[in-house]
């Protein structure tokens, strides 16, 4: 399992490591509980790998944790969320943003499956 953590904040500081530890241990609310179009006031996003047992198969998945301005964590295990969040992390770091707004987007695939994505909004 990969221990690499990608985040908008410094994960080598005590504060950064505490955020990751708390996200891993508490998990926070699921992104699935957010309404389509919900705006999250974020102060950080991090991604890390975890092993999950899916119907008897162990597989490594990317967890995306969004840290909110009010101290909560919203988490998701989703390929589309991970892809969007990875790009958001890059932009937030490039422009050195301390806080930013993320919009939750729920969509349906052609087969009727619901999936989520994230948008960076001003």
From Swiss-Prot:
GO terms for biological process: DNA replication; viral DNA genome replication. Keywords: DNA replication, DNA-binding, Early protein, Viral DNA replication. The keyword Nucleus does not apply. Pfam families: Phi29_Phage_SSB. InterPro entries: Phi29_Phage_SSB. It comes from the Viruses. The keyword Transferase does not apply. One of its GO terms (molecular function) is DNA binding. Monomer. Binds to DNA. Single-stranded DNA-binding protein required for the elongation during viral DNA replication by strand displacement. Displaced viral DNA strands are transiently coated with the ssDNA-binding protein and therefore protected againt nucleases. The latter is then probably removed by the replisome that performs lagging strand synthesis or during the events that lead up to the recombination process. Has helix-destabilizing activity since it removes secondary structure from the ssDNA in replicative intermediates. Belongs to the phi29likevirus single-strand-binding protein family. This is Single-stranded DNA-binding protein. It comes from Bacillus phage Nf (Bacteriophage Nf).
């Amino acid at each position: 399992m990969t221990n690499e953590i990608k985040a908008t904040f410094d994960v080598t500081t005590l504060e950064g490591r505490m955020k990751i530890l708390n996200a891993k241990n508490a998990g926070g609310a699921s992104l699935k509980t957010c309404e389509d179009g919900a705006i999250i006031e974020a102060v950080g996003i991090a991604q890390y790998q975890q092993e999950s047992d899916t119907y008897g198969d162990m597989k490594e998945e990317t967890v995306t944790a969004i840290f909110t301005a009010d101290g909560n964590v919203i988490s998701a295990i989703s390929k589309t969320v991970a892809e969007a969040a990875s790009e958001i992390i890059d932009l937030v770091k490039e422009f050195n943003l301390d806080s930013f707004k993320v919009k939750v987007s729920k969509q349906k695939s052609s087969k009727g499956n619901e999936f989520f994505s994230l948008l960076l909004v001003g």
